[in-house]
Swiss-Prot record:
The lineage of its organism: Eukaryota, Metazoa, Chordata, Craniata, Vertebrata. The similarity among the IL-1 precursors suggests that the amino ends of these proteins serve some as yet undefined function. GO terms for molecular function: copper ion binding; cytokine activity; interleukin-1 receptor binding. GO terms for biological process: cellular response to heat; cellular response to lipopolysaccharide; cytokine-mediated signaling pathway; fever generation; immune response; inflammatory response; positive regulation of canonical NF-kappaB signal transduction; positive regulation of cell division. This is Interleukin-1 alpha. The modification Phosphoserine is found at residue 83. The gene is IL1A. It comes from Canis lupus familiaris (Dog). Glycans are attached at residues 98, 137.
Length: 265
């Protein structure tokens, strides 16, 4: 039986005597250029296709180091760090929209004026024709003859407003979205604290948003509770309160958490 090549032994042989072999991710990243500049033979295909379990059987290194090397060779880890230059991908959106357990870690640091020059590019609709209920089990409906929203206890949910959620790119780990009334061009637009949100008509779905950040909300989810935080005013959330229109608020006495009810399979 042919001996399985030892991937980690080959990797260590590619380092010069003056370079220290390290198992830490940051150290591996710093030495990556020198790694590729070394004049060593490329690894055999059979060696590159080994699974993590097969590799761990032929190496004395720890499991943590196995994961590091596999990641360096292009394998996608379940937990990964998004850098400031890396956008949220379609796979990330699927994970978020379908409530999987994937963890997207936040960048280590963000510049103070980071959001000032940020632009948000449209990706796609990630949820269609859903209803928002507050924790009093009241549904969001349109105010008769106006460009405002209110809440009502409904017997027939067909009378509730149906929303579409459009996802946009972000240069951090948050997910900015727009809330559009389904089958219309009316978008929810954040206002100042305690002011009612407006329904703003747009000629089309904005492909890039720079200044119109009132249309964007960071969608946050904690269990079955959903929150929509204004991108333009990050301390304010879409909120409801009895005998008031849907408005922007920091928290109590307003209700800022919602249940999202799907109306389509």
């Amino acid at each position: 039986m042919a001996k399985v090549p030892d991937l980690f032994e080959d990797l260590k042989n590619c380092y010069s005597e003056n370079e220290e072999y390290s198992s830490e991710i940051d150290h591996l990243s710093l030495n990556q250029k020198s790694f590729y500049d070394m004049s060593c033979d490329p690894l055999h295909e059979d060696c590159m296709s080994l699974s993590t379990s097969e590799i761990s059987k032929t190496s004395q290194l720890t499991f943590k180091e196995n994961v590091v090397v596999v990641a360096a060779n292009g394998k996608i880890l379940k937990k990964r760090r998004l850098s400031l230059s890396q956008f949220i991908t379609d796979d990330d959106l699927e994970g978020i929209a379908n409530d999987t357990e994937e963890v997207i870690m936040k960048p280590r640091s963000v510049a103070y004026n980071f959001h000032n020059n940020e632009k948000y590019n449209y990706i796609r609709i990630i949820k269609s024709q859903f209803i928002l209920n507050d924790n009093l089990n009241q549904s969001i409906v349109r105010q008769t003859g106006g460009n405002y929203l209110m809440t009502a206890a409904l017997q027939n949910l067909d009378d509730a407003v149906k929303f579409d959620m459009g996802a946009y790119t972000s240069e951090d780990s948050k997910l900015p979205v727009t809330l559009r009334i389904s089958k219309t061009r009316l978008f929810v637009s954040a206002q100042n604290e305690d002011e009612p949100v407006l329904l703003k008509e747009m000629p089309e779905t904005p492909k890039t948003i720079r200044d119109e950040t009132n249309l964007l909300f960071f969608w946050e989810r904690h269990g079955s509770k959903h929150y929509f935080k204004s991108v333009a005013q990050p301390k304010l959330f879409i909120a409801t309160q009895e005998r008031k229109l849907v408005h922007m608020a920091r928290g109590q006495p307003s209700i800022t958490d919602f249940r999202l009810l799907e109306t389509q399979p």
